[in-house]
From Swiss-Prot:
Principal cellular location given in the protein's record: nucleus
Repeat recorded as keyword: yes
Protein name as it appears in the record: LIM/homeobox protein Lhx3
Membrane-spanning residues: none
Gene assigned in the entry: LHX3
Listed SUPFAM superfamilies: Glucocorticoid receptor-like (DNA-binding domain), Homeodomain-like
Summary of the tissues where the protein is detected: Isoform a and isoform b are differentially expressed: isoform a is maternally expressed in the animal half of early cleavage stage embryos, and zygotically in the sensory vesicle and the visceral ganglion lineages from the neurula stage onward. In contrast, isoform b is expressed only zygotically in the endoderm, notochord and mesenchyme lineages during cleavage stage.
Pfam families in UniProt: Homeodomain, LIM
SMART domains for this protein: HOX (SM00389), LIM (SM00132)
Residue ranges, compositional bias (Polar residues): 482-501
Keywords, sorted A to Z: Developmental protein, DNA-binding, Homeobox, LIM domain, Metal-binding, Nucleus, Repeat, Zinc
Lineage, uppermost ranks: Eukaryota, Metazoa, Chordata, Tunicata, Ascidiacea
Cited function: May be involved in the determination of cell lineage of endoderm and notochord cells before gastrulation, and in specification of a distinct group of cells in neural tissue after gastrulation.
Any GO molecular function: DNA-binding transcription factor activity, RNA polymerase II-specific
Ranges of residues in domain LIM zinc-binding: 280-339, 340-402
Length: 692
């Protein structure tokens, strides 16, 4: 018997073939042993041989000789394979350990194989015997299925004329699996031992369609296709390097659907940690690289088809740019990491023409004024602001001029009106404060002023009249108001008590008079306003008219309001006057909070108004038909403080000189009738203003 031990140069796996030549009896036994695990699959009969993707693989054929039995060959092969697991870069040929450089041992005689030893017995001298000659088989995928007692399935390749096959070191890993087929293309039933089969040398072969030809009788065998190779399903194992849900584990006798042929190959190779460490890992996907070609970028390996631009996914073949573990094409690299345009912030390729402003770089299209968006060319003067924005010279000077005017307080030119023009406008205003359009046009032509100027003058004049009227009323009635309490003096302070409870009071209307009275027991309580419930202090009833005199009437605990002139004797009757009191004082201009003069209750002229210049003018009895009085309550929430310098109405009821001047100066005509004797006409205008 001739034992052929074929070893890959990378010392990963071994294949042992034992053949016997007897009369009408030939036996083939193929065993695949894995070096890393040390396990011998001798009961599986035939398993596809393997080879490392970076080494050359040479397989020699030996000669056939007879062996006593199949079991003896199996036992011997098992022992020898266990020894071969630790042998590197050496081969067993004919049962003898030789170096790689030594020629294959070729004994032309017959050999007898025993369990413990190998002896050679030459019993046949015919070298040209068809049964003894070497059979050269090709790698055509004429696959047949054989069944043995163990129940495992295997396939055999067809014959080939070559004796040795050399694989490219950088060939694809899917072509490293060999197939076997029967010599006579027949199918044997299970348990048929003693039938002769011939082994063949595995090699690659491609047909015209670049596909695998599978016989009809073997199409029911689960197979795996990868490239141009056909691999039996029993040789598929889990690949520890592959990721995903397709990873499966199998054992002899358990059929699974294989994932890929690469998984099967590298699962066997990965059992050796040294070999796994030598397989490069792709920098991009971090998977092992088993391609024929490897691309390197800065000494970092990449898949040949995986070197793509990180931004545009363009295939990089000649030149690329890297940053860290990322690779880019030229355009995308400069867009991301190149010089940025100050205006738009985008990257500028090195081939593009740019403009510079100090340390700033701009696109040609982005070098423009940010105000007028006018593109600036070569030789144009521009200004660079603090925020790196560009301004053309024209816009910069205009903006600078406006800023200077604001800082210096320069206002728009104002229209000057002469005295003659002013007299014409005042005369027209006295006739009509709101002239029509045709009147304004006539005034514009007479005065030579613009029509818009005439219109604005009338608007300002009306606003001034309204403002003067409001200010005059505020000065006249403001001394009646103060905050929280009446002014008090050292002699007789008068304070407004806070109302803690509302007492019952009676309202009596006598004719046209409305009298609010309260009980005599409530003299210590202050009155309440009939409008908002705030405490009030009863002051006298004061009336003003063009021909009337000022009259006042005080009554203890009462505020009398007279709307007409009937029943006036009852009001002016001395018995209705308040009793004599030392606390009744008259206001003075210097200190309006003091009542400094005692009054005689029998004299109706004891009350004094506020005189001009601080002198006290006694009141005289007035005719009944000239009295027009009203009730003036004092609100404690008021914030009005009397102004000592204010000129009030004289005792005669006529306006003072200062009031007359204010009215006469407001316009060319007399507006005396517009000034109301009551603050009700202008207090409503101040509701939205904070009290004073």
């Amino acid at each position: 018997m001739n034992l052929m031990f074929h070893q890959a140069r990378n010392n990963n796996s071994f294949m042992v073939a034992a053949t016997s030549n007897q009369q009408h009896h030939k036996t083939a036994l193929h065993v695949l042993e894995d070096k890393a695990s040390g396990q011998v699959y001798d009961n599986q009969r035939i398993i596809a041989s393997e080879q490392h993707s970076y080494g050359e693989y040479y397989i020699d054929e030996g000669k056939e000789n007879s062996i006593p039995s199949e079991s003896s060959a199996r036992d011997y092969c098992g022992k020898e394979l266990n020894k071969m697991a630790s042998v590197t870069k050496e081969s067993y040929v004919g049962g003898r350990l030789v170096d790689e450089d030594e020629d294959d041992y070729d004994d032309e005689g017959d050999r007898e194989v025993y369990e413990d030893d190998i002896t050679f017995d030459d019993d046949d001298d015919d070298e040209n015997d068809d049964d003894d000659s070497d059979v050269k088989m090709n790698l055509r995928t004429n696959v047949n299925k054989l069944r043995f007692d163990s129940g495992f399935e295997y396939t055999l390749p067809t014959s080939s004329p070559e004796n040795m096959t050399s694989f490219n070191p950088m060939s694809d890993s899917s072509h490293l699996f060999s197939d076997y087929s029967k010599h006579n293309s027949t199918i044997l039933a299970n348990g048929k031992s003693g039938t002769s089969y011939l082994t063949s040398t595995p090699r690659r072969i491609y047909d015209n369609t670049n596909m695998i030809n599978i016989p009809e009788e073997t199409k029911n065998i689960p197979t795996c296709y990868n490239g141009n190779n056909h691999v039996p399903s029993e040789s598929i194992f889990d690949n520890p390097l592959s990721s995903g849900a397709n990873r499966r584990m199998t054992s002899p006798g358990h059929k699974i659907q294989p994932s890929t042929c690469s998984d099967m190959l590298f699962t066997l190779l990965a059992k050796d940690n040294k070999i796994e460490a030598e397989i490069p890992k792709c920098t991009g996907c971090e998977h092992r690289i088993f391609d024929r070609f490897i691309l390197k970028v800065q000494d970092k390996p990449w898949h040949s088809q995986g070197l793509k631009c990180n931004d545009c996914s363009a295939q990089l073949s000649e030149k690329c740019f890297s940053r860290g573990n990322l690779v880019f094409c030229k355009d995308d690299f400069f867009k991301r990491f190149g010089t940025k345009c100050t205006a738009c912030g985008h990257g500028i390729p090195p081939t593009e023409v740019i403009r510079r402003a100090q340390d700033n770089v701009y696109h040609l299209e982005g070098f423009c004024c940010f105000l007028c968006h006018e593109k600036m060319g070569t030789g144009d003067q521009f200004y660079l602001l603090e925020d790196n924005r560009l301004v053309c010279k024209k816009d910069y000077e205009q903006a600078k001029s406006r800023d200077a005017d604001i800082e210096n307080g320069v206002k728009r030119p104002r229209t000057t009106i002469t005295a003659k023009q002013l007299e014409t406008l005042k005369s027209a205003y006295n006739q009509s404060p709101k002239p029509a359009r045709h009147v304004r046009e006539q005034l514009s032509s007479e005065t030579g002023l613009d029509m818009r100027v005439v219109q604005v003058w009338f608007q300002n004049r009306r606003a001034k009249e309204k403002r003067i009227k409001r200010d005059t009323g505020r000065q006249r009635w403001g001394h009646f108001f103060s905050r929280n309490q009446l002014p008090s003096g050292p002699t007789s302070p008068i304070s407004a008590p806070v109302t803690t409870g509302q007492k019952k009071r009676s309202n009596t209307k006598c004719g046209n008079r409305l009298i609010h009275c309260k009980d005599n027991q409530q003299n210590s309580q202050s009155h309440s306003s009939p409008l908002d419930g705030s405490p009030v202090f009863p002051i006298g009833s004061i009336g003003t008219g063009m021909q009337g005199e000022i009259g006042a009437s005080f009554q203890s605990g009462c505020a009398v309001g007279i709307e007409g002139t009937s029943d006036l004797p009852s009001v002016m009757d001395p018995k209705n006057l308040p009793p004599y009191s030392e606390t009744l004082m008259s206001y003075t201009e210097a200190n309006p909070s003091h009542f400094v003069h005692g009054q005689n209750p029998s004299d109706v002229t004891y009350m004094n108004t506020l005189p001009v210049g601080g002198s006290h003018v006694p009141l005289t009895a007035v005719p009944q038909h000239n009295i027009s009085a009203f009730s003036l309550p004092f609100h404690m929430e008021g914030n009005m403080v009397p102004d000592p310098s204010t000129q009030f109405m004289m005792a005669t009821g006529h306006l003072g000189s200062q009031d007359t001047d204010l009215v006469s100066n407001s316009s060319g005509r007399s507006n005396f009738s517009d000034l109301s004797a009551s603050p009700g006409s202008w207090l409503g205008e101040l509701e939205h203003v904070q009290p004073f």
